[in-house]
Amino acid sequence: MRLDFLDEFKDPYMRTPLGQGVFLAGVALGYLARFQVEGEKDLTSAPLFKQLEFGRMNMKSLKKLLARIPKLLAAYKEGMKYGGLISALAAEANGLILKGEEQELGVDGNFAFTTGFASAPTYFWKIFGKKPEGDDDTA
């Protein structure tokens, strides 16, 4: 897992363990949501997407979503090629969140989460290496 690109972010929130954890949580959940729609272009139809309150998420709701990842991965394990990578990324996000100062997400946290979620395929492959040839951006 390569996370050195996080050092390139100049945003003060993204320089904290909490900010990095929230961002990585967005990447993990965003990639998982893309699997739920299995290649469809309309990410908004993903069940996970419908549960998110973009811009109004708090730490409690984020932790609830992260706690559900193992169950979601188990439910979707058939046909999911990268479930282990999503699990590892979620574990890293959880660890960083636990290392950070306990605080509400606020504007900075919601922005970091949404950025990770919206750009999940790009950052997922930046973290785990080059996307295999011919693969789409579903898990």
Description of each model-found segment:
Residues 1-139:
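Intrinsic-disorder/low-complexity detector
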